[in-house]
Amino acid sequence: MSLPAISLYTSPPPGAVYSSEFDPSSRGSSPPCSTAPPSTSHRPPAAAGGLSCLFSSPAAAASPPRAPPHDELGALWQDRSDEPAFAGGGGGYSSSPLKWRDLHHHHHHSPVSVFQGPSSSPAASRSPPASWLAGRDRDRERLFAGFVRNALGSCVDYAPALSPRSEVGGGELAFELDENLAEASPACEPCARELLAGAQARHRIFHEELVVKTFFEAEKAHRGQTRASGDPYLQHCVETAVLLANIGANSTVVSAGLLHDTIDDSFIDYDHIFHMFGAGVADLVEGVSKLSHLSKLARDNNTASRIVEADRLHTMLLAMADARAVLIKLADRVHNMKTLEALPLGKQQRFAKETMEIFVPLANRLGIASWKDQLENLCFKHLNPEEHKDLSSKLTKSFDEVLITSAVDKLDRGLRDAGLSYHNLSGRHKSLYSIHNKMLKKNLTMDEIHDIHGLRLVFEKEEDCYRALDVVHELWPQVPGRFKDYISRPKLNGYRSLHTVVMSENVHPFEVQIRTKEMHLQAEYGFAAHWRYKEGTCRHSFVLQMVEWARWVLTWQCEAMNKERPASLGDSDAIRPPCPFPMHSEDCPYSYTRQCDHDGPIFVILLEHDKMSVQEFQANSTVMNLMDRVGTNTPRWSPYRIPMKEDLRPKVNHEPISDLNRKLSMGDVVELTPALPHESLPNYREEIQRMYDRGGFALATRGGSSRR
C-alpha cells in the first residue's frame, strides 16, 4: 500500500483524548464500531529520538486517524469530542529535499536515522532543488493553509496540508508501506481490526509481533468498554501508543502503552502480563498504574492548588519511576486533554488545572516541547476560554505569509553564497499559550512580541550555527539586546539553540533560531532523543542514561527556586542549575561521583483521615519518623486525634507493615488507619477526649496550688 508523503517536522498526530481518570459511571457496552479510516489530512512527525536500546523503533509512517484518549486511573471514562481547532498537526515548511528511499536502505532504521537523512557535504547543499522552486508558488496556498490553526495548537513548525500523493513535493519524505497487516490474529470485533490497520498505516512499529500481540490482549481486556462519547475504550489505548511511537519508543514501551490501563480497568493483573509479555512490559504497566493512582489522589485532594505540594508531586513522579513509565503517563494525559468538552465545566477546569500544575512541569523537565505545548494550549483553552478566543483571533489577523516566505528565500540564498550546507530551513511559530504567558509576565501587547513568527535553521555541526548567525546578521539588521546563546549556556532542561531577533525589510521584527540536529531532537523529544542520538557512540549507553537521569533529578531544587523568585529580580535564566541536563558544569561536585543512590530529600504520599498530602523527609527516614511527625502536628483537641502511635495501623503501598523502622522510599504511599474497628472509633475518641480534659484540668489545678 502506497501512502502519501509526510513532512519531516510534523508534530504528533491529532486525536481524541480519553482518560481513565474521569467518571467511572460512564462505562458502558460498546456499540458496533464506527471507527473512521485513517485520515490523510494530517501527518505525524518522523519519529525522532528515543531511549537508547529501549527507545529504538522503526520510522514513522503515514497519517493517523482521529481517535479517542484515556488518561489516568483505569476506572475512569471520558467522552471524546471534536479535536480543538488549535490542536491540529503541524509540520515544517522545509527546504530539505530528502527522500525516504534514500533512508530506507540506511543501516540504522531508528527514528534518528530518518531525521538525519543522507550525509551532507558542502558540494551537495540542502538547498531546494530547481523543481521545488519552480513549483513553490503553486504549492504555497496549501503549504500555509493550516499555519494559523497550527500556531494555535502545539505544533513546532509549519506543515503543508497534504492532499493525495500526487501533491507530494520535493521537500517531503515519501513513505512506502507494505500492505501486510497483522497475520494470524485472534477473534475480535471488526472495529478493533480497523484500529490496528489504522495504527499500522501510521507507524511501522505496529507491525511488530510483540505490539500486535499486546494489541489483541488490550482488545480482549477492554472489550465491551466504551467511553462517555460512545467510542471504544481501545481507541484511547491505541492513540496513547501512537504518541509514544512518534517520539521513538521501542516495541516494549509501545506495548506497555497499549496495556497501560489494563491493571486498573480490566481482569488482567501484573502476573498475567508478566507471563504473556515478560517483565519489561509488565513492570512498565505496573508503574503507570501507580502513577495513575497518585494522580487520582492528587486530583481528588486538589493538590494542584497547593504550589509546594504540586512541585513535590511532579518531582516525585520523575524520581520514583522508570522514566519510560512517566512518558507513558504523559502520553495518556496528552490524549485525554483533547476531549475535555464531554465533561461538565467544573470537571474540565479541575482536570485542566491539575494538568497545568503537575503534567506540564513533567513534560518540561523531560524536555518534550511538543507535548508540553499541546498541554499548555489545551489547558489555556479550558481555564481561560475568553482570553484564548481573543488571542486566537488576533493571531489569525497578524499572520504574515509574505514575510515568512520571502525570509526563507533570502536566507537560503545567503547561506548558499556563504558555502553553508544546512539540514533544514523552515518557518516556525510560538504557541498560543506561550504568547499569552509572555504578554502577562512582561506586560506586553501582542505587537510588542517579536518571536511569534520566525525561522528555524538546522545544521549538522555546531560551528556552522555560529557561521550562519553571521550570515543572518549580514542579511537583516539585528534588534539590540535580543540575541541569546543557549548553546554555550543551556536552559534548565538542556535546551540548546541560538536565538536572534532581526528587522525585516518592512520594519517587522522576527526571530531566527539556529541549532544542530542533535539540539533539535533534544528540544522536541527531550531526554529520549538525546540518548537515542548518542547510542551509536557508547556500548553501555543504558548505564549512562540512568546515571544522567539520576543527575538531572537533582536540578528540581533549582527549578523550584526559579518558580519562587520574584519576577522583578530579572530574567530567571540567570539562575543556573549545578547540572544542566544532560551535562555537568565544570565546577559541579557530582561530576565524577556515583549518582545511582538517591541521597536527597524523598517525597511520600500520606493518606490520613481520607485526606492526602505530599510530605518531604530526609533520606533514610523511616515509617516511625513519619508517625512521629503526624503525632506532633495533630492537635490534641481534634476529633480525629488518635493519641498513641500504637493505635495506628500503617500501610505502605497498600500492604500492612509491622516493622516501623522500615525505610521510606521516593513515592511510597503511606496510609495511617486506626487499629480499632471503624464502628468503635466515635466512642473511643470521646472517651480519650474526656480523659484528656479531666487530666489536663487536674494538672492545671495542682500546678496552680504549688505556685501559691
From Swiss-Prot:
Protein name: Probable GTP diphosphokinase RSH3, chloroplastic
PANTHER family: GTP DIPHOSPHOKINASE RSH3, CHLOROPLASTIC-RELATED, GUANOSINE-3',5'-BIS DIPHOSPHATE 3'-PYROPHOSPHOHYDROLASE
Domain HD: 233-337
Lineage: Eukaryota, Viridiplantae, Streptophyta, Embryophyta, Tracheophyta
Targeting presequence: 1-58
Gene that this sequence comes from: RSH3
Induction statement: By jasmonic acid (JA) and infection with the fungal pathogen Magnaporthe grisea.
Functional note: Probable ppGpp (guanosine 3'-diphosphate 5'-diphosphate) synthetase that may be involved in a rapid plant ppGpp-mediated response to pathogens and other stresses.
Domain of life: Eukaryota
Entry keyword annotation includes Metal-binding: no
Region (Disordered): 1-50, 109-134
Species name: Oryza sativa subsp. japonica
Gene3D superfamilies in alphabetical order: Beta Polymerase, domain 2 (3.30.460.10), Hypothetical protein af1432 (1.10.3210.10)
InterPro entries: HD/PDEase_dom, HD_domain, NT_sf, RelA_SpoT
Enzyme's top EC category: transferase
